[in-house]
Regions:
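Alpha/propeptide regions of enzymes that mature by internal proteolysis
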Residues: 2-4, 10-13, 18, 29-320
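C-terminal segment of classical bacterial N-terminal signal peptides
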Residues: 22-26
């Protein structure tokens, strides 16, 4: 069977869930994949298969999509080998690991944290902001104080590998492209949709820089009547176009998730004059389980998980 770059490239097994996934026909991301029933999880980037596996395990236990998103993203946040999220994330120009995260549930509630330090799981803090305060976002020292008051512990998130990369960067100031946010969307057995995003942001960014990840409507937007979208890449350009919100609204207007992602990338493309060191990618899902993904440049992959499969799909892109 011929597998094109538009189709699935890998099939894995759900780790830790006790389920051995069968390889089945690949998903064609251009015509979409529709599910009549059952839970589904999608997330940005191939290394996050393990996060999808955990999220699906949570859904199969009967928990809701918000629980699944949080527990799935926690896996990536705690991975010291992931240099763009949580523990092990590359620091800013001052050697500080600062994190951004956001979360939305099927009721339209949202919470986020920005520029938070020393807390390993910002996705969980973002959820508490949503559930325990009247606010949507907390930032910096205030976000950290809130986390500590709610039982989170202060931890050093700078690993030796990340520290060495920062020291090497300080010597020669060579730009390192590293902005691979995890964005996850999940639909549970009750057909309720939630989403979440977590990142350590651009490697060696200016101290104080905040990207799109904690901005509702930029890196994340979910509407339980329509679907949801997440972004990854250079957040400055996502913020300028509110890409995830735009995608969901285009879906509301009748576009498929795939066509809506393409629309958002084309709008971004038209606004740019210099494409050097810039890439943005979007991932979207409708309430029927149809998935779409599109990127400005090549290389973007996403994870697609149901109760019977856990696989990586390669996205199409604009700038061939």
């Amino acid at each position: 069977m011929k597998i094109t770059r538009r189709d699935f490239v890998k099939t894995g097994a759900i780790a830790g869930s006790g389920l051995l996934l069968n390889q089945i026909s690949p998903i064609n991301i251009f015509s979409g994949s529709k599910l009549s029933n059952g839970p589904i999880v999608v997330s940005t980037w191939s290394p996050n298969l393990k996060s999808n596996a955990r999220a699906m395990e949570v859904l199969l236990q009967g928990k809701n999509s918000l629980d699944a998103v949080e527990e799935g993203i926690i896996i990536t946040e705690a991975d010291p080998n992931d240099s763009s999220v949580g523990y092990g994330g590359l620091p800013d120009a001052d050697g500080k690991v600062t994190l951004d995260s956001s979360i939305m549930d099927w009721k339209g509630n949202a919470g986020s944290v920005a520029f938070i330090e020393d807390i390993m799981h910002p996705i969980s803090v973002a959820r508490l902001v949503m559930e325990k305060t009247k606010h949507v976002m907390l930032a910096g020292d205030g976000a950290k104080k809130f986390a500590l008051q709610n039982g989170f512990k202060e931890e050093n998130l700078l690993t030796e590998n990340a520290k060495n990369a920062w020291l090497k960067w300080k010597e020669n100031q060579v730009k390192k492209e590293n902005h691979d946010t995890i964005g996850m969307l999940a639909i549970d057995k009750m057909n309720n949709l939630s989403g979440g995003v977590s990142t350590s942001g651009l490697a060696f960014k200016l101290h104080g820089r905040v990207g799109d990840s904690p901005i509702i409507g930029a890196a994340l937007f979910a509407d339980n009547e329509i679907g949801g979208a997440v972004s990854t890449g250079n957040g400055e350009y996502v913020m300028r176009t509110l890409g995830s919100f735009l995608i969901v609204e285009k879906m509301r207007g009748g576009l498929s998730p795939q066509k809506a992602c393409e629309f958002a990338i084309n709008r971004l493309y038209k606004s740019l004059k210099d494409f050097t060191d810039i890439n943005v990618s979007y991932l979207a899902i409708s309430k029927s389980g149809e998935v779409g993904a599109y990127s400005l440049k090549g290389g973007f992959t996403y994870c697609f998980t149901t109760p019977i499969e856990n696989k990586v799909v390669t996205s199409d892109f604009l700038m061939k």
